[in-house]
Amino acid sequence: MLTVALPKGELLKNSIRLLQSVGLDFSAFLDSGNRQLQITDASGTAKGLLVRGQDVPVYVEYGQAQIGIIGYDVLREKQPQVAHLVDLQFGYCRMSVAVKASSPYKSPLDLPAHSRVASKYVNSAREFFQGLDLPVEIVPLYGSVELGPITGMSEAIVDIVSTGRTLKENGLVEITTLYESTARLIAHPLSYRLNTGNLHQLVEQLREGALTKV
């Protein structure tokens, strides 16, 4: 039986709609009263796992799920050993550097050397500033990263931005974009190579389904 890892949160609804378009129904995960973390499609051919977004590539890499749907931001940060198959064209957001709107910094290179940068995307932040040859201290934060500059703990943040509303409401402004992110279909490399459970056909159906929704 095929197992699909699905992310809790923003990507879940569109992920389920896409899977429904190819005949796999995990819509029970969207029910407000649902407490199940694992359900089987009515056809009996596939099982869905509902997990934290950060954990989707882990389940796929270790083979507990043959495929999964997750944002490119997570893949870029975690660098898991999975097969990257399809850009699903939904869940758009961007990884950005932001500072206080009242600050003098108009670009990352305006930041003083050894500034503090708060982020839950530690690897992405470090890679970016190393690429600029600008030494900074990355401060790991895993909630309300915007408070870093507000409280003075950091001069900047690196975080995911979708509409920019949260930044604006907290007096922050973007000064550059590291990369853009959308939902991606990933697979366990060996399962995909061996075409376990006719995986290639399903992937092509999902690819076509994603294209028709663009």
UniProtKB/Swiss-Prot annotation:
- List the GO molecular function terms: ATP binding; ATP phosphoribosyltransferase activity
Q: What class of enzyme is it?
A: transferase
> Which BP terms in the Gene Ontology apply to this protein?
L-histidine biosynthetic process
Task: Please name the InterPro entries in this protein's record.
Answer: ATP_PRibTrfase_cat (IPR013820), ATP_PRibTrfase_CS (IPR018198), ATP_PRibTrfase_HisG (IPR001348), ATP_PRibTrfase_HisG_short (IPR024893)
Query: Localized where?
Result: Cytoplasm
> Which GO cellular component terms, listed alphabetically, does the Swiss-Prot or TrEMBL entry include?
cytoplasm
Alphabetized UniProt keyword annotations = Amino-acid biosynthesis, ATP-binding, Cytoplasm, Glycosyltransferase, Histidine biosynthesis, Nucleotide-binding, Transferase
Q: Which domain of life is it from?
A: Bacteria
Q: Which Pfam families match?
A: HisG (PF01634)
The family note in this entry says:
Belongs to the ATP phosphoribosyltransferase family. Short subfamily.
Q: What is known of its domains?
A: Lacks the C-terminal regulatory region which is replaced by HisZ.
- Protein name from the UniProt record: ATP phosphoribosyltransferase
